[in-house]
Amino acid sequence: MRQNCILSILTVLILTTLSDGYENYLYRDYSVRNTYNLYDLVNNPAFLRLNNHEDLMTYEIRTGNQENGYQRAFDPERIETAGVDIFSYKALDEKSALATRIVYETSSLNNLYRSLEKDFYSDYFSYTDTTTGDVSYAGPRLSVIYNREIFSRLLTGLQIDYGIERGLKDVYTKCESISRNINVIWGLGYSSYSGTSLGASVRYFDRQGSYEAVKEITDAIVNTYMGYHIYYPEQPRSTNEKKVYAEGIEIDGQLSKKGFLVPSLKIEIAGGYGAKENSINAGGSSNPVQRGYWIREGGFANSILTYGGKQSKIGLELMAGLKRYHDWASPGDYDVINIENSITDIHYGIKTIIPIQSISLTIGYEAGSEDVNYHEYTVDYVFDEQLSRSLIFTDVDISLNQVMQMHYSVWFSNFEPWFYWNTSSIQTQGIEMGVERLFVFGKIGVSFQMEFWKPNDEMGSIDHFGIAFSFKK
């Protein structure tokens, strides 16, 4: 339902990974819980105008808190986040449209043990020292999308995303970091009057990161990890620096067909292939050396089959997909591979949408498996496992009256994590509630979310809380 889409936007992924927006990842993760339009399938800017028919302006303020009662070695005890999000869409004329988004986010990582990274586990060559302290991050992000119909039903679009973020640790080594990220997508699309749409896009992304750790006390030693088990101790000096250079390219395609086999059936297929390279330099500011270099390449495919329409009583959606990639990493001093990682991820899901007068009830199930073959050759460590996951969810959208809608969600999931979690499985449960009301001047909404992670047979849990306020006109 339309209300469901709006209220989902209002929450804006409060519990997403902290580094999202200041980092670019290959491919994307699909979930049957979400609704995907032509633009969303692969973020093809050529289809932006087909999914937006009215000018729109939204403002959102959100805040979140995560208490890590259960921690990995390099996790903080608590994470506090806050952000402001402004989005605008405007049709310039009958053939072109422009969308912009400005986001400013802050986050505080409290009692972070040794790590000088925002997420130690997201890289094979992470920076640490020997202190525990608080780290604060802040920075803006800007997105601009321009879309135009160049011939009858033939569309093109350009999307540019830019983000910058600064971080500072409050104890020596007083590590200061800055991350600059750019993402550019150019797309073509064709949408026929019969309901068939074809699209292709090319994406280039680039990231540069800089870390500067100042020595003040003798035991504040800086290290560069190579994998998750060994590290290189940097030489004691007044200033240690780390530079990260990453860039990649991805080519995606998509197909959508309404009236597939029967009038109420729609099929959507998306796929892509890409590669990303990362170079890490560390040492003194006058003579940095390469500490590591790693490459990721692979691809994905995803399909969605949707049944529903004006003549149907219920809606049904099936989803299935595959993601596969391979990593190679080598230390800077030697021309050998010391880390190799292969991932094959399969997912599938089903959901049904049942309208009951003024209520829309969605019930769904999702499952998947991640086949991991991770090998560190220097210490001869192998993690070769097939990790399973599952999710059950229910969404309820209620039209209380002509000017007020309410949204309610509850979900339960279980997944088997990587070795650095030190537990065999983690169970999660969450709840989200939101309400939106129409006034003469626009719509005001509020959404609240809670999610709890409980490791198997372990003391403690990870508790997430978030709230968002929005205004739309």
Show where each model-derived region lies.
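N-terminal, post-signal peptide beta-strand-biased segments of exported outer-membrane/organellar beta-barrel
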Residues: 17-110, 123
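Membrane-embedded beta-strand positions of outer-membrane beta-barrel proteins
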Residues: 57-61, 100-102, 158-160, 186, ...
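Transmembrane beta-strands of outer-membrane beta-barrel pores
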Residues: 61-67, 104-108, 148, 162-166, ...
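Outer-membrane beta-barrel channels and translocator barrels
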Residues: 91-95, 149-153, 191-195, 258-262, ...
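Short, flexible helix-coil linker/hinge segments at the edges of structured domains or between repeats
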Residues: 114-126, 203-245, 277-292
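Long, internal scaffold/assembly segments composed of regular secondary structure
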Residues: 230-353
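Outer-membrane beta-barrel "beta-signal"
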Residues: 461-473
